[in-house]
Amino acid sequence: MNLNPLTALSPLDGRYAAKVDALRQHFSEFGLIRARLKVEIEWLKALAAEPHFTEIAAFSQAAVAELDALIANFGPAQAAEVKAIEATTNHDVKALEYWIKDKTKANPEIVKVSEFIHFACTSEDINNLSHALMCEGARQQALLPALDAISGKLVELAHAYAEIPMMSRTHGQPATPTTMGKELANAAYRLKRARARIASVELLGKINGAVGNYNAHLAAYPGYDWEGFARRFVESLGLAFNPYTIQIEPHDALAELFDAFARANSILLDLDRDIWGYISLGFFKQKVKAGEIGSSTMPHKVNPIDFENSEGNLGLANALLKHLAEKLPISRWQRDLTDSTVLRNMGVGLGHALLGYDSLLKGLGKLEINADLMRADLDANWELLAEPIQTVMRRYGVANAYEKLKDLTRGARVSRDGMQAFVATLAIPEAAKADLLKLTPWDYTGKAAELARRI
């Protein structure tokens, strides 16, 4: 069966292919090979630029341009050529080394030093740097922009709904009023912190040989400061240098990154469920798109499908990302191969995350507030004012203030008239009593509006 979006095993390459296209250049097999190519070429150029290595002369501008062109012009057709070589070698990194040698064999300047391609490297020297570059590219070009779009929309809605009062629900029961804008501001603030954590994770790299000790490097050039050279090279790629490794870079930084994404995803999953609940209560309506169908049998339905899709994909993402974070730092002795197949699923976990972000943003764009229903909800729950009334009573020394309000309101519905009749009996200053008599559930929102506008 030919592979296409209808026959793809994973929905990321099938139904949702267009929505995760931004990640394909980073986490596909092509993306991995291209990242490896960049590392191999930059390593060769760095060796040539170091005067200490007299056996490899500095490249001319033309030679450097030819090497850079290999990276710039590398596409799926070139990746297929590498895969064809791998069919013989049964080794992916060695196949790329042979491909580079073949593509540069017509250049006498490069072919003369072709044995410095992949010089002193173990495959993991190339792979760890490639994986870090892939994650960095995806983080900067696709994932952070997607989170920023959600953050921007949440701030926009928080400001728009800053003063629209809403009855809170703690344990699913009526609780102290807030505003819808403040609740969305809560999510925006949490996401801002999670986003900062994602952005702050330093991705590490190493290029220190088979077990991390520069054995082969020092055998070829004894006494040379290979650690300093490796540090400069890794940092030239925009990565942080890890001086202590086994054959693999231990992946602690990748684990930190995936944990950080999982934390952001949990925040957004929480938001998905809350918005779903507000839609269920009728506090939000969803804009209807002509031609769309909500149910195959119930024509009236407008379902919260975007938030449900987001919740499902973020859950899938976290299952994978948490496994990556737990598994990757563990390797038997100086290395085993269990990380290799797991690392190939980085894009799957982050792909489901990106799908979740896309669906959530789409859903947020469809929301319309139902302020009248929210006010009616508050108007039906005047017992919410038990909190401010008993607090003012306590200020003025009224004995058993909490207990008196508990007797009046616990498990009961109390009308406006009932609450005001109770207030009228209180032995508190007349000004305080007047303030309580003016108080309503819809204006008992504290600093909610201010906090929402401030986000």
Language model features: what each stretch is:
Residues 2-217, 221-232, 294, 307, ...:
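A helix-coil-helix interface module used to build multimeric assemblies
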Residues 123, 218-221, 230, 234-236, ...:
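A structural signal for small-residue-enriched, beta-sheet-centric alpha/beta enzyme cores
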Residues 136-144, 148, 155, 185-188, ...:
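Short amphipathic alpha-helical segments with heptad-repeat character
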Residues 42-47, 99, 103, 153, ...:
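Generic, well-ordered alpha-helical scaffold segments in large soluble proteins
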Residues 1-34, 62, 85-86, 282-284, ...:
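Glycine-rich cofactor/substrate-binding loops
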Residues 104-110, 199-202, 280-283, 318-322, ...:
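Proline-centered turn/helix-capping motifs that create local helix->coil transitions or kinks
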Residues 159-162, 199, 203, 276, ...:
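Alpha-helical coiled-coil oligomerization motifs
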Residues 221-318:
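Acidic, glycine-rich loop-and-beta core segments that form the ion-binding/anion-interacting portion
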